[in-house]
């Protein structure tokens, strides 16, 4: 269905431009009508996009399926080369000690 509102507003604008002598009134009316047209078309486009995305949401998403299939378990540590240094720091520095009364060794102290 063709929306006849823009055609109607164009006819109204041309009629106003022909009949009205004052430019400020004409420009005010033209700006109000064009603002209304812009807002109306943006609302219509957004409404159409929302309907489209709602229909897409009902279908299966192949990207989600492939992502969940390829996802690695959380037990994988990407910084395994750092594990010995972390173990040494756990034994050496104060944040690895369970005894709150032991002397903390500050990092960077010489």
Swiss-Prot record:
Q: What GO CC terms are in its UniProt record?
A: membrane; virion membrane
Q: Where in the cell is it found?
A: Virion membrane
Q: Which UniProt keywords apply?
A: Late protein, Membrane, Transmembrane, Transmembrane helix, Virion
The answer on whether this UniProt entry bears the keyword Membrane reads yes
Grouped into one coarse class, the protein's main location is virion
TM stretches of this protein: 10-32
Q: What membrane topology term does the record carry?
A: Single-pass membrane protein
Briefly describe its induction.
Answer: Expressed in the late phase of the viral replicative cycle.
Family indicated by similarity: Belongs to the asfivirus H108R family.
Q: What is this protein called?
A: Inner membrane protein H108R
């Amino acid at each position: 269905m063709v929306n006849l509102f823009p055609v109607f507003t164009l006819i109204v604008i041309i009629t106003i431009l022909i009949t009205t002598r004052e430019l400020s009134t004409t420009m005010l009316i033209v700006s109000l009508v064009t603002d209304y047209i812009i807002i109306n078309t943006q609302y219509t486009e957004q409404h159409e996009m929302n309907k489209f995305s709602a229909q897409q949401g009902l279908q299966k998403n192949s990207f989600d399926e492939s992502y969940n299939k390829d996802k690695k378990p959380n037990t994988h540590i990407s910084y395994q080369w750092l594990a010995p240094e972390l173990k040494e720091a756990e034994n050496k520095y104060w944040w690895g000690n369970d005894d709150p009364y032991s002397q903390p060794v500050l990092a960077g102290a010489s």
